[in-house]
């Protein structure tokens, strides 16, 4: 009797656990200069986030991206890519674009207005397929570049992109013959982890280099 009860209780708890959601929250400044909390949610053990909640002191709006609107968010950064908005939200997504019908990693840039994500740039693709990205002011102009690790024909690239007027342009890059896995950075330095160890990322004469 007790054994069946315990088994039944365990099954119910396990199902509820599997159906529960995990979340991550961060703050962003909207177009009116007001602080907004952005929360991403996904089912436990799912790989990607597709539920976005935006909230301030008075209101809450939740957006669920599914079917043809699925985003599959795998990374997020906030920063300021140009002078058009107070702050930008940049998502790394894994989906199909209207003009590039292949599932792949992409970079989407949004601003926040009235608790809505306003698309600023949704890339069909960058120069080459990306494995990671971050925001970093690599040239010291006061605005963040979208810096991406790209892979093409066995080579690794670190490319920096500027976004303006609804388009994105690669302005700096470096080419490397070894595997580069991901970005890490603190307040001062942008670094990458590679098969040869960890290096800081630098820029000289418009060329990205590792030091």
Where are these regions (language model features)?
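N-terminal Sec-pathway targeting helices
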Residues: 1-11
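Beta-propeller-forming repeat regions
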Residues: 15-211
């Amino acid at each position: 009797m007790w054994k069946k009860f315990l088994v039944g209780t365990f099954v119910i708890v396990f199902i509820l656990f599997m159906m529960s959601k995990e979340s991550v929250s961060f703050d962003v400044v909207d177009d009116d200069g007001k602080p907004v909390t952005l929360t991403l949610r996904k089912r436990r053990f799912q790989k990607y986030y597709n539920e976005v909640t935006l909230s301030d002191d008075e209101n809450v709006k939740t957006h669920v991206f599914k079917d043809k609107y699925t985003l599959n968010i795998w990374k997020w950064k906030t920063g300021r890519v140009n002078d058009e908005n107070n702050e930008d939200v940049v998502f790394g997504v894994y989906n199909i674009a209207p003009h590039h019908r292949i599932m792949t990693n992409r970079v989407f840039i949004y601003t926040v207005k009235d608790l809505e994500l306003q698309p600023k740039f949704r890339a069909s693709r960058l120069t080459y397929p990306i494995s990671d990205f971050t925001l970093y002011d690599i040239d010291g102009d006061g605005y963040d570049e979208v810096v991406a690790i790209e892979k093409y024909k066995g080579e690794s690239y670190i490319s920096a992109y500027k976004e303006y007027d609804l388009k994105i342009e690669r302005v700096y890059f470096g080419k490397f013959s070894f595997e580069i896995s991901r970005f890490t950075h603190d307040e001062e330095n942008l670094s990458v982890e590679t098969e040869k160890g960890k290096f800081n990322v630098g820029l000289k004469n418009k060329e990205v280099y590792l030091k």
